[in-house]
Regions:
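Short aromatic-glycine-(Arg/Gly/Cys) micro-motifs in beta-strand/loop hairpins
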Residues: 12-35
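Short, conserved beta-strand segments within well-ordered enzyme catalytic domains
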Residues: 18, 43-45, 71-73
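Short, flexible loop/turn elements at secondary-structure junctions
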Residues: 21, 48, 76-78
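N-proximal short alpha-helices
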Residues: 24, 45, 102-106
């Protein structure tokens, strides 16, 4: 059973954005990079401005293309339905469980996922969080201290679609 925060929930279709340097006509999970927050998958954001920031970073990193925000609709009732065909994990906020999950995924440089979720929703490990993650991995702080320090940092939320089944529920607009 999945519980979704009212803050993230809308009635009907949820609009999600993916920042890139190209128009994405067909999502190809094989192009996913290893060592990401929730694993290899397709990452989306409910905030169009944040997706544009990612598009700008991607264009600069790839040194080609122009910043483009691809938009998708997703039926968010699939996140809370008891009979959903999808395996969904939602992290409401920074937590010990979230931090351990991020660490496992970031350390995984194989093509085999460390979890079996179709969709994962939760805070982005942005620059501030990334700094804390590096401090943790270098042994300067422990995981409990990291989570405590992040408690005062307002999280930006990301949506991870990690399987073809999950991708099939995204409708490009």
């Amino acid at each position: 059973h999945v519980v979704v925060s009212k803050e993230w929930r809308t009635i009907g279709m949820l609009k999600l954005y993916h920042g890139s340097n190209v128009v994405i006509d067909k999502i190809d999970l094989c192009r996913s990079r290893k060592g990401k927050d929730f694993g290899c998958g397709f990452y989306l954001n409910p905030n169009k401005d944040q997706a544009m920031e990612m598009a700008v970073r991607t264009s600069k990193r790839m040194q080609e293309g122009e910043p483009i925000v691809n938009a998708y609709l997703f039926d968010d009732s699939l996140l809370s339905s008891e009979c959903t065909p999808l395996s969904v994990k939602i992290f409401e906020d920074y937590s010990l469980e979230w931090a351990e999950f991020i660490l496992k995924n970031r350390k995984n440089m194989t093509s085999h996922p460390v979890h079996s979720y179709d969709i994962v929703i939760g805070p982005i490990a942005d620059d501030t969080v990334g700094l804390q993650m590096r401090r943790l991995m270098q042994g300067y702080i422990d995981i409990e201290r990291m989570v405590e320090e992040l408690r005062f940092h307002k999280p930006a939320i990301q949506y991870f679609f990690g399987t073809e089944k999950a991708i099939s529920y995204l409708k490009r607009i």
